[in-house]
Structure formats: structure tokens, C-alpha cells
Amino acid sequence: MKPINVGLLGIGTVGGGTYTVLTRNQEEIARRAGRPIAITRVADRNLELARQVTGGKIDVTDDAFAIVSDPAIDIVVELIGGYTVARELVLKAIENGKHVVTANKALIACMAMKFLPLRRKKASSSLLKLPLLVVSPLFKAVREGLAANRIEWIAGIINGTTNFILSEMREKGLAFADVLKEAQRLGYAEADPTFDVEGIDAAHKLMILAAMLWLFVHSLCRGITKLDAVDITKRTDKGVELRVHPTLIPEKRLICQCEWRNECCAGQGRCCWPTLYYGAGAGAEPTASAVADLVDGTDRGISCPHLAFQPDRLVDLPILPIGEISSAYYLRLRAVDKPGVLADVTRILGDRQISIDAMIQKEPQEGEDQADIIILTHVTVEKNMDDAIAAIEALPAISGKVTRLRMEELSR
């Protein structure tokens, strides 16, 4: 059979790993696919790096558009990142009837609807693939194994970089900046780590997951930059609830065992028991492996609707405003140690129908007149908590900002 020619756009950390994985496992992939699959052209602005990674064995160019327009290329792997050039390259590749594999979550989350109608029109055997590292098994389960099931909620740790940083900080007592530098040295974090540490990458993944679970696509990028890293999504009567933020969960939940650069995702459906998917998330090889797997699957004609539903069935579901979500809360505040402060705080909470589950006041350090107060609340509405925190912070006896963490049982 005719070999499958792959054009690789971008040969940085992930691109270099993808080239290595596909080259190293070439014989195994060929046995499974029934014919050879090989990267035959690479595009990168750094030609010297491209030649170094490929060993000068294949054609390299700094013109990515030449590859997406090359009739000899069957599959385009886009690993450049970003919204602008990557978008034009993907659109051009689709127009030219090529299969596209991309690890660019931001591009898919924000521009899926630009691609789906064109991709369907071209009637190719596979559309855009969404290699989201450890959560891709969940995608397969939803799209292929749970097609008759209604998923109620999913929750997880879906950014390996932030999980690594938090694990290192806890275990070694290191500062955030020091651990971030180590993550960058190990290749777990990008030179500009904003997308990871601000929760934006996790939000992109969560938006795509929500689209796959609930026919929801038009609003994929709404509110991305305003999302506050456990990630939670569920469907309610009022709309889809999407949240990306640090969360306290019971120690007995399996998600609590997810450490270092690993990621995990748990979900529950009406007809199935809770399931959990776990694996390495940060680093070149896990990402490259996911990309290589999708290249192999694309050639073998493994085709399902890419957002789990037929394109003409997708709808625009509302995202529940963050003020309308319900959660229990952990609050930590620093207050002057004097009579009446606790009474003021509890009055503020009570006036807003916020019930206290437990409260601890720590003793002040020697020579200090301020103490930490920790409050656990029962489930309440977010907007009520916002109002309460603003009122508490306005009290003269309160120093600084109130620390707030949401708490989830993950059993609803």
C-alpha cells in the first residue's frame, strides 16, 4: 500500500518528541496501520534546529504553507501553537483535503466552529483530532464507549505542569518561583508559563470536554480569561457549569492520589459507575505520544464525530454565571485578636444565609496581636459568598484579603 506522508509544522519540544516517537516506533506503527507512516517534511523557523533534530534525513523548510499545500502530504501535524498563523495553516490544510492533527487546545477551544463546517464539507474520514494528553481516553470513552450514556459531571486535574509545581512546593517546601524554574528546566513548563499557571490551558481543555459531553460548541471560548487548578464541569437545568480553580476535595477520593506531572479525570454518568483516567500529562514524550497515536488512528480511518455528536446536532448551551454556582467553602482570614471580631464575621455570614460547618481560631504568635481564623461553610451560592467576603474584608479588624477555596465532594 502507498505510504502515508506526514508534514510536521513546528519541531520544538513537542514537535521534536513527536518526530522521535514516530521515527522510533515506525515499524510497530506500520504493522498496526498496514502501511508505513513517516514524517517526510518539517517546517520550522529555526532551520538549524530542524536539521539537528531530523539528522538531515528529510526535507526541512521555514515555509509552513508549502507543506500544507504539498500534494504529497497526507496528514498535517500542527504543533506551532497560537491563534493566528496556526489558524491559517489549519484552514489551508483542510481546504486542501488533508487530515489534521493538532495539540493546539487554544485554537480548537476558540475556533472549532470555523473548522467543523469546512471539514464536514470536505467529507474526509476524520476531522480535527483533539490530543488532550491523559484525558484523551475519556474522550474515546465518551465518543465511542459511552455513546448511549448521559454524563452528569466530570472533575479532574488536567494540567500536569501546575500539578507538578504544587506537588514540589508541598513536598519540598520550595517557593513557587523556584519550582517553576525547575519545571521549565525539565521541559514540563513553557518559557512563558502563563497558560499553565493561570489555568488557561486547563480551561481550554475543560471547554472542549464540555462540548464533547453536552453538544455544546458555540460558546466554547466565553470567559476563558476570567476563569480563576481542580477542574469541574457539569450540566444543570440552567446551563453548563464550567469551573477551573483550586479546590479542596476529600482525601478518600482517588483524584487525591494524582501527584507530580500526572493528570487525571473522573466522571459519572446516569448508567455507569464513576470512572477515572490517569497518566503523565506534562513533558515532551506524553504529548508526542498522544499526537503520534492520533496520526496512526487517522490513517486507520478511526472516525467518530469530533465533538461526540454530529455537527448538525450541536447547539449553543448557556454557561452558568459563576455567581450562580453552589459550593461549600474554606475561608481563611487574619484578624486582630480582640472580642467581637468573630461575632461580626458570623453575623455577616448569617445575614447572607451562609451556614458555618466548622470554625477554628488559631492562637496568635508570640508578640503578635493578630490570629488566623479558618471557617468551613455548608453549600451556598457563590454571589452570596462574594458579598460576604467583601463585607468581611471591610471590617477594621481584618487584615488583608480573605483566602477562599471551594470544596467539592465529587459525589453529586
From Swiss-Prot:
One Pfam family from the record: ACT
Entries under CDD domains matching the protein: ACT_HSDH-Hom
Family per similarity comment: Belongs to the homoserine dehydrogenase family.
Reactions this protein catalyses: L-homoserine + NADP(+) = L-aspartate 4-semialdehyde + NADPH + H(+); L-homoserine + NAD(+) = L-aspartate 4-semialdehyde + NADH + H(+)
NCBIfam families the UniProt entry points to: PRK06349.1
GO biological-process terms attached to the record: isoleucine biosynthetic process; methionine biosynthetic process; threonine biosynthetic process
Domain ACT: 330-407
Binding site for substrate: E190
E.C. no: 1.1.1.3
Catalytic residues of the enzyme: K205 (proton donor)
UniProt pathway: Amino-acid biosynthesis; L-methionine biosynthesis via de novo pathway; L-homoserine from L-aspartate: step 3/3; Amino-acid biosynthesis; L-threonine biosynthesis; L-threonine from L-aspartate: step 3/5
PANTHER family in alphabetical order: HOMOSERINE DEHYDROGENASE
GO molecular function: homoserine dehydrogenase activity; NADP binding
Keywords carried by this UniProt record: Amino-acid biosynthesis, Branched-chain amino acid biosynthesis, Isoleucine biosynthesis, Methionine biosynthesis, NADP, Oxidoreductase, Threonine biosynthesis
Protein name: Homoserine dehydrogenase
Annotated coiled-coil segments of the chain: none
Residues given in the record as NADP(+) binding sites: L9, G10, I11, G12, T13, V14, G15, G16, K105
